[in-house]
């Protein structure tokens, strides 16, 4: 008999390696709902409340806190304990004045990086692609599954791999960061995950091979990574704080 619908369960041993959870303490893990991020690059909101920040001891306590609307993601109240919170998302707790940005660390684990209240209103969004829509508009599609409409006359200001600094929750574009030589990038995946620096060279390959970028870190060391792993976060220097 065929399976009906998506999977609803997840064993802890099979959970993504990017999650900071105990693997052998319990059998089951919370499976994130389909949403803005895929399972590998996000973590359920319940684990942020309970395991990361320690505001609850049990899943029941964590769900109660979320149902009271005490946690915001990108400036919006989120009550679904399975909501996937991913890279560059901002988690805010108004009652305590805490703000965090979700970023990977050097071993590929998703961590909460403390940020200021002012920075909590800024979210970098990497452009995955763009498409024409009705009404002489162009739709920008971002890495977190969201999109934004711009006038057709502005389409040449936005290209794939560019980063848009978005004001949240208003969803207003504040600045566009081109993917070019000299741009400051943060590596989100691969063996050089969480390293940062300036782009020295962009190597393009034919026949469908992925493009590679050479980056110079703050110590002057050069390293290569795939273009899709390099997330532009500034021009001469980063526009957001990084670990």
Swiss-Prot record:
One of its GO terms (cellular component) is cytosolic small ribosomal subunit. Gene3D superfamilies: 2.30.30.30, 2.40.50.740, RNA-binding S4 domain. Residues 43-105 form the S4 RNA-binding domain. PANTHER family: 30S/40S RIBOSOMAL PROTEIN S4, SMALL RIBOSOMAL SUBUNIT PROTEIN ES4. The keyword Metal-binding does not apply. GO terms for biological process: translation. Belongs to the eukaryotic ribosomal protein eS4 family. Signal peptide: none annotated. The gene is rps4e. GO terms for molecular function: rRNA binding; structural constituent of ribosome. This is Small ribosomal subunit protein eS4. The keyword Transit peptide does not apply. HAMAP family: Ribosomal_eS4.
């Amino acid at each position: 008999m065929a399976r009906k619908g998506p999977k609803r369960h997840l064993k802890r041993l099979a959970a993504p390696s990017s999650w900071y959870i105990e693997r052998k303490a319990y059998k089951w893990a919370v499976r994130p709902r389909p949403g803005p991020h895929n399972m590998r690059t996000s973590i359920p909101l319940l684990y942020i409340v309970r395991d990361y920040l320690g505001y609850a001891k049990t899943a029941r306590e964590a769900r109660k806190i979320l149902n009271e609307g005490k946690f915001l993601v990108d400036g919006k109240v989120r009550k679904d304990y399975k909501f996937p919170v991913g890279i560059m998302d901002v988690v805010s707790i108004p009652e305590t004045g805490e703000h965090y940005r979700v970023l990977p660390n050097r071993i590929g684990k998703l961590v909460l990086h403390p940020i200021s209240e002012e920075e909590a209103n800024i979210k970098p969004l990497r452009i995955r692609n763009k498409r024409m829509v009705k009404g002489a508009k162009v739709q920008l599609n971002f890495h977190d599954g969201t999109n934004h409409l711009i006038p057709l006359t502005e389409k040449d200001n936005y290209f794939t791999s560019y980063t848009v600094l978005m004001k949240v929750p208003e969803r207003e574009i504040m600045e566009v960061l081109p993917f070019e030589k000299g741009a400051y990038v943060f590596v989100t995946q691969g063996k050089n995950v969480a390293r940062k620096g300036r782009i020295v060279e962009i190597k393009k390959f034919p026949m469908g091979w992925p493009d590679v970028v050479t980056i110079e870190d703050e110590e002057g060391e050069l390293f290569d990574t795939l273009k899709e792993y390099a997330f532009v976060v500034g021009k001469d220097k980063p526009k957001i704080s990084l670990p």
